[in-house]
Amino acid sequence: YGSCTVNAYVPLAKYIHETFDILDSDVNVVHNVAKHKLENTLIRKFCTLEKSATNLLPFLNKDNFIVNYTVVPYTGVSIIDFRFRLTKATSLENFLSKFEDAITDGVLKGLYGMDEVDIGPEVHNCTTFSTNFIKENIKIIGNNLYMQGYFDTENSVNRYVDLVNFAVTRHQ
């Protein structure tokens, strides 16, 4: 369990690194604002992911990981874009096959969802997924993997519930 951006990035980056070996990565976040804070204007600010990811994932450091985080006066679902530079290129078909297996029946099951096409952000309001990816927008150019998704920033409580349920099973 972590912040909404930590929940969106860390399990995904761990999986991609273990499967395809990450050289460097950057994340672009356009983050919503809670309704009671809407009077604030567009701001760039620090994101929990900037510090947490490099502490949680030993293959990342300040020299190979960047987060661009912008808060916008909007109460809907947030947008997150990932870029991973891989040690060696893989085909889009190979990546999608492995990734779809991982989110359907594998190590990422229950954490991530994927839509074939972009059906807009608001359908992902109150989702239980840390990120909902858009399959048609997943691209590989050279050894760079690009992924776009939506996440409900106010709903990272789902990962807390997962953590509590996990802890309960460990103490029974």
Language-model features and meaning:
Residues 1-36, 151-153, 163-171:
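N-terminal Rossmann-like NAD(P) cofactor-binding subdomain of oxidoreductases
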